[in-house]
Amino acid sequence: PVIFLVLACTIGRFLIGLNSLRKKEIGFVSKITSKVSYYLDNKGKHFAITGVLFAVVFPFLPFTDRYILDVSIMILTYIMLGWGLNIVVGLAGLLDLGYVAFYAVGAYSYALIATTFGWSFWVCLPLAGVFAAFFGILLGFPVLRLRGDYLAIVTLGFGEIIRIILINWYEVTNGPDGITGIPRPTFFGLPFKKIVEDGENSFHTFFNLEYSTMHRIIFLYYLILILALITNYFTLKIRKLPVGRAWEALREDEIACKSLGVNPTNTKLTAFAIGATFGGFAGAFFATRQAFVSPESFTFIESAIIVAIVVLGGMGSQTGVVLASIFLIGITEMFRDLEQYRMIAFGGAMVLIMVFKPKGILANRKPTITLREHNSKWVKHY
C-alpha cells in the first residue's frame, strides 16, 4: 500500500507540473496539440473523406483479422453513440448521464420484436429508433426546467430506472438472464450460415464463395459504418437548420433564446428525441450483433464512457468524437488481458487529455454560420 501511495503521489505531482507547463504555454506538447487541432479544424473535410475511404477498404487490408474487425465494430458503435449524445450535450448543452437508457431501449425493443414476431432486422431497426425517441421525449418533459448538475442527476437516475426495470420485469425482459436467440441480420434475405436447407440460399452459396465466418463480421462492420455515417450526415445537416441553430443558441444563453422567440420546451424535446433515436439504432445493432442482451450490458459505466468521448473529443465536434473513441476504446482494448489495469489506463488517458486539452481534442470548432462582407453586402457562409 505504501508503494502504491508513493506512486500515486508521484504521478499526481507529475500531472500538476504538466498542468503548470500548459498554463505557461511552453513545451512541445502544447504546440503539437495546437497544430493538430488547427489542422483538423481547418482541413476537416479532407480528413473526413480520407477517413471514410480508409474505413471502406479497412476490412481488406493485410493486417486486418477478426479481432481487429471486432474492435473496429466496437469503436464504430461508440462513435455512433457519441454522435447521438453530441446532439444533446455538445449542441444543445444538456448534460445527459443516462444516455445508456436509450441504448438499452433500442436493444431490448429490437430483441423483443424480432423474437416475438420474427420480423427482420430492417423492419425492427426503425421501430427501435421510434421507441427510443419516445423514451427520449418521456425523459425530456420532467427535466425541462433543469440544467447543469440537476439535469445530470435526473438523467443519471433515469438510466438506472431503466436498468432496474429490465432486471425486475422478468415476464417480459427475462430479468437478469437476458434475451437469447435474437435473429442475425441478413444480406437482402441471404443468411450468413454454413448449413442451409434444401432450396434455400445463403450468402456464400449465392455468390459461389467458400464459407467463412468473416463474411458475417465484415457485413456487420459495413452495417455499423453505414449507420454511423448516416448519423454524422444527419447531424451535420440538421445543425444548419433553424432547429440546429436553436440548439446552439440554447446552449449559450436560454434567456436570450426566449427573448428571440425560440421555444425552449420544443427545442429541448427535439434534442432529446433525436439523440435518443440514434442511441436506439445503435442498441438495435448491438442486439443483433451479440444475439443476446441483458441488463448488465447497460450500466452507468457505459454512459460515463459515452459522455467522456463527447467531452474529451470537444463539445459539438464530430471529428473529435471519432478521435476520442479510437483513443479511449483502443486504450481499454490494449489492456484487455490485464483486467485490473484497464480502468487505470482509461482514467489516465482521460487525465492526460484534460491536462493538455482541457476543452477537448478539437475545442475550437468553426461556427455553423459566419457572416462575411462581399460587395458591400453581408452574406451567409455555411
Where are these regions (language model features)?
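Transmembrane alpha-helical segments in multi-pass inner-membrane proteins
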Residues: 1, 84, 100, 125-129, ...
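Cytosolic-side transmembrane-helix boundaries in multi-pass membrane proteins
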Residues: 1-53, 187-194, 198-202, 252-254, ...
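Residue-level recognition of pore/gate-forming positions within transmembrane alpha-helices
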Residues: 74, 78, 104-108, 129-133, ...
